[in-house]
Design a protein with these regions (language model features):
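Membrane helix-loop boundary segments at the extracytoplasmic
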Residues: 22-29, 236, 362, 366-369, ...
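Hydrophobic transmembrane alpha-helices of multi-pass, membrane-embedded glycosylation machinery
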Residues: 37-45, 201-204, 244-257, 381-384, ...
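Membrane-interfacial helix-loop-helix modules of multi-pass inner-membrane proteins that assemble, modify
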Residues: 79-107, 142, 152-195, 229, ...
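Hydrophobic transmembrane alpha-helices and their immediate junctions
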Residues: 371-409
């Protein structure tokens, strides 16, 4: 009983983090990052207490545990053996007396220490969600939470577009010279908002699919259809072109995966389906007029002229020049912002402006973590997608509950979308997106064990109870 209280508390607190992080500027301010970290820490501590009281091991794959432990050890060593601290006033690295002089260490101790705290918590969340996903009830609750959070963020963005506000609703507009024009919803940068929406709207679509494919109540169908339409409209209203392109690719993938199922379910009510399609079309037209969809269309028209002169190309060349110096362990977690200016000044083709992130998460990870850390992160991320695909193909039809069979492909599709987005932007550097990616990876890795805890769990429990009853009667 006590262990269940701690377990339930840890899960509800985790759901609170899923709500808080996107609304708190996407986890891009120091305050929102600290609060999110504390909430995640509370959830993980309660989960560990629940494991100790119940005397059970977490239901996670061994390979996942090894990868998370290896990443924490490598990053922790880089912090422990840090070689310097970056002085922002004089733009110089101040040497430190480190433990091993000729062994790799971070070039900036404070940044790497802060980043590793966040990384350790997020890696713990991957394990936490892998364990949580073994429960069909909590898996469905997690699905609902993601759908509601995505719909709320999308609605905020649409309201801002419709009212023509100059800044996020609860913030005063800054002076014109420093005015932010790329915000959307609670995110300062529309690219991050688009990446987040592309993570959540496929799961909103899955809730619609589940509602129509099963005998759900009409109000459930109406609710999740509305949430899905709002989220899709927000993707269209957002001016991030990459997010819109990825959304189109995700929509095609979802239609290929679930289109035949929906067609079979809707053929029995053609008139209802036709009326619903007409209503959806009218709603989308109304949305387009209200949220000024002509703005993202104009950005598409002018994009061809900007591609060749985009400063990201210069930054990419500078970063590529720094790769040989990163070596096996990199410059240290989170140190791109202090390493890049040094190489940019020395470059023949300097990238203008200040670069906190590279707009290429893979290359930035290689610089910060080196080849060893980069390979481990790739195994965690892409290995999770591969594990999810293999589990789905092998166990979905004979052993998984219907909700798992619908959810898992959508999770993998969403992860592929953010992986593509990371080629030209920095979604994987934003804590709210990192949190949702960690959640999805936990679902993918946890699916390895769904064959043991899926539909057969309740059947085995009933058989065990019947066997014990029969044994007791015999005695």
């Amino acid at each position: 009983m006590i262990s269940r209280i701690f377990g339930n508390a840890s899960r509800w607190i985790f759901f609170g983090a899923l709500f808080y992080a996107p609304w708190a500027y996407g986890g891009t301010t120091s305050e929102s990052i600290q609060v999110t970290n504390w909430v995640l820490l509370a959830a993980l501590v309660l989960w560990l207490i629940e494991l100790l009281i119940s005397r059970r091991k977490p239901r996670v794959p061994r390979l996942l545990f090894f990868l998370t432990a290896a990443l924490i050890c490598i990053g922790g060593w880089m912090v422990f053996n840090a070689k310097s601290v970056y002085d922002t006033d004089f733009s110089v690295f101040v040497p430190l007396h480190n433990f091993a002089l000729h062994v790799a260490g971070s070039v900036d101790y404070p940044i790497s220490a802060a980043w590793m705290i966040r990384a350790a918590l997020l890696l713990g969340i991957v394990l936490f969600v892998a364990d949580l996903s073994q429960s069909k009830r909590w898996l469905l609750r997690l699905w609902y939470v993601i759908g509601l959070v995505g719909g709320s963020i999308a609605l905020l963005g649409l309201l801002q577009k419709a009212t023509g506000t100059l800044m996020i609703f609860w913030l005063p507009p800054p002076p014109y010279p420093v005015r932010v024009t790329t915000f959307f919803a609670s995110y300062y940068y529309h690219g991050n908002a688009g990446a987040f929406l592309n993570l959540v709207w496929p799961l909103s679509a899955g809730l619609v699919i589940r509602a129509f494919a099963s005998a759900s109540h009409p109000w459930m169908r109406a609710t999740w259809t509305s949430v899905f339409l709002i989220t899709i409209a927000a993707v269209l209203a957002n001016t991030s072109r990459m997010a819109q392109l990825i959304a189109l690719l995700l929509l095609i993938a979802i239609c290929v995966q679930f289109g035949p199922l929906l067609l079979r379910k809707l053929t029995s009510g053609k008139s209802v389906a036709l009326a619903g399609a007409l209503a959806i079309g009218l709603a989308l037209i109304a949305f387009a007029q209200a949220v000024h969809l002509e703005q993202p269309l104009k950005r598409w028209q002018t994009e061809a002229q900007r591609i060749s002169t985009d400063a990201r190309w210069h930054a990419f060349r500078v970063a590529m020049g720094a790769v040989p110096h990163a070596r096996l362990c990199g410059f240290g977690p989170g140190t791109f912002r202090v390493v890049f200016p040094t190489y940019n000044i020395q470059s023949a083709n300097q990238a203008p402006g200040t670069w906190r992130f590279l707009h290429d998460d893979y290359l930035q990870t290689l610089l910060e973590w080196g080849w060893i850390g980069g390979i481990l992160w790739a195994l965690l991320f892409f290995g999770g997608i591969i594990v999810g695909i293999r589990s789905y193909k092998k166990h979905a039809r004979p052993e998984w509950a219907p909700r798992r069979r619908v959810l898992q492909p959508l999770v993998m599709i969403a992860l592929v979308g953010v992986a593509v987005h990371a080629l030209v932007d920095f979604p994987l550097q934003i804590e709210s997106i990192q949190l949702y990616v960690a959640t999805y990876l936990g679902l993918c890795w946890g699916s390895m064990l769904w064959k043991e805890h899926g539909l057969r769990t309740s059947e085995n429990a009933l058989r065990s109870t019947s066997w014990h009853s029969a044994t007791s009667a015999a005695h």
